[in-house]
Design a protein with these regions (language model features):
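C-terminal His-loop and adjacent cap/lid subdomain of alpha/beta-hydrolase
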Residues: 1-131
């Protein structure tokens, strides 16, 4: 399982939903766990029609689709699941309603191996999050 959550989600905060779920799952499954947690900065799954969303946030759906592709490769070709990680995006900036187009630099890939400063460590119910 891969959970993808936007760090800036103010209606379903990560600290009250995904992070506790990941911690609980680690207590239940321990080292056997196949759960991966991807937390995306500057992203939330609500509010795409709110003023300024385009300048301050990136689309979280893109990361849902990428995670689904990774899971498909895992199930059909035995590709390894990505490490749990923070994906650090870059807002587009600009004028609300007229943000520049998304570029690859705005929406980096989920990587197979997280950089040490982006790795989420889950152990014995504790979820250690990088800033």
């Amino acid at each position: 399982m891969i959970i993808v959550h936007g760090r800036n989600d103010d209606r379903v905060p990560v600290s009250f939903s995904s992070r506790p779920h990941v911690g609980l799952e680690s207590l239940e499954d321990g080292d056997r766990s196949q759960l991966r947690y991807i937390e995306v900065t500057n992203a939330e799954h609500f509010g795409t029609d709110l003023p300024g969303f385009d300048t301050r946030m990136v689309p979280l759906t893109l990361y849902h689709l990428r995670a689904l592709d990774m899971m498909w490769e895992h199930l059909t070709a035995k590709a390894p699941l990505p490490e749990s990680q923070v994906v650090r995006t870059t807002p587009r900036g600009g004028t609300p309603g007229k943000a520049p187009p998304l570029e690859p630099a705005n929406v980096p890939q989920i990587t197979a191996h997280a950089r040490p400063e982006d790795r989420i460590v889950v152990e014995n119910g504790r979820v250690a999050m990088p800033d």
